[in-house]
């Protein structure tokens, strides 16, 4: 190949690269040019929906008008599949969670891949699982509880919407402590809390926001936090490790993702906007009121987190033989 031809090829590549960079820059400057849709695979009014609306409001003021599209059903898979199939243009986002991106794929599988089907944008917040017992259980500490459970194998029960996060938390706790407790299926956790207070249900594994009213009223007792550190909502409740147990960590978490193939420039911009919002005292306070801790990080860190969580939840689902109800 002659030197002249090599120069022409290099010049052509340089022009192509320059044109590509110009197009990317122009696209970034024009985004968004229309409304952004945030799919929330939960019903309106619950804690996940409330957090999603906090984030949507922040994006509306910092990036562009963002509207909520609630698509609940099938353990979050209906809305999640819709997001995975959307155009990767930055105008359809998903409010992802430990249910949609870790638990549901492990239970059902095949509909979407939590790692390959999405472009992670930002981790938003998390809350640890708490083991709380009702008046039917005499134990005051987790050590007393484990001793009591081992003395009464198969006699204690815990509320477990089949295939739901509280069910997985209970199965993880069983495996970590070697106790024999029995899951009781509930379609609505409201009934489970009623039964716990009445002494008809022995224990519940759930996030602080749902348990706190009962704990503060003295109707339930929190024994342990299933996380690496204590929660600000219950500062006197020890972690698993502090209780001399395996350092088990399981949280309910949520974050923002987009369909796989979404331009990196959009992902980067949205990540910066989310992280800026999570530094806001108002958003921190709003999340704290929901028993949730704000988290920040890069898209790459969130991608690694999703992969790790998907494996953790899948391992528990497989070992416990759980199936989607």
Regions found by a protein language model. Name each.
Residues 113-124, 159, 180-184, 202-203, ...:
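Short beta-strand->loop
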Residues 1-8:
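N-terminal secretory signal peptides that target proteins for export/translocation
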Residues 82-91, 98, 105-191, 240, ...:
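Hinge/capping helix and adjacent helix->loop/strand transition within the periplasmic-binding protein
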Residues 28-116, 154-156, 162-166, 178-203, ...:
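N-terminal (or domain-start) structured segment
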């Amino acid at each position: 190949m002659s030197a002249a031809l090599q120069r022409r090829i290099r010049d052509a590549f340089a022009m192509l690269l320059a044109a590509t960079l110009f197009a990317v820059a122009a696209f970034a400057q024009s985004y968004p040019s229309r409304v952004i849709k945030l799919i929330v695979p939960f019903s309106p009014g619950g804690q996940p929906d409330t957090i999603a609306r906090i984030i949507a409001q922040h994006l509306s003021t910092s990036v562009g008008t963002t509207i909520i599209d609630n698509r609940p059903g099938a353990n979050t898979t209906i809305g999640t599949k819709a997001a995975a199939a959307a155009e990767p243009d930055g105008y359809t986002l998903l409010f992802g969670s430990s249910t949609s991106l870790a638990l549901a794929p492990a239970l059902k599988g095949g509909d979407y891949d939590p790692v390959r089907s999405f472009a992670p944008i930002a981790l938003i917040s998390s809350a640890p699982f708490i083991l709380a017992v009702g008046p039917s259980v005499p134990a005051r500490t987790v050590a007393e509880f484990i001793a009591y459970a081992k003395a009464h194998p198969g006699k204690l029960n815990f509320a477990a919407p089949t295939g739901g996060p509280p069910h997985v938390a209970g199965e993880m706790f069983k495996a970590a402590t070697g106790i024999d407790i029995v899951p009781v299926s509930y379609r609505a956790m409201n009934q489970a809390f009623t039964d716990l207070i009445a002494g008809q249900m022995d224990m519940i594994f759930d996030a602080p926001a749902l348990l706190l009213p009962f704990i503060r009223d003295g109707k339930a007792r929190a024994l342990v936090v299933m996380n690496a550190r204590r929660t600000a909502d219950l500062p006197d409740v020890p972690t698993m490790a502090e209780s001399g147990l395996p350092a088990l960590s399981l949280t309910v978490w949520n974050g923002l993702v987009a369909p796989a193939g979404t331009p990196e420039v959009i992902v980067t911009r949205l990540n910066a906007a989310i992280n800026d919002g999570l530094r806001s005292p108002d958003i921190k306070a709003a999340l704290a009121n929901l028993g949730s801790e704000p988290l920040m990080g890069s898209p790459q860190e969130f991608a690694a987190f999703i992969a790790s969580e998907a494996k953790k939840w899948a391992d528990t689902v497989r070992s416990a033989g759980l199936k989607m109800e």
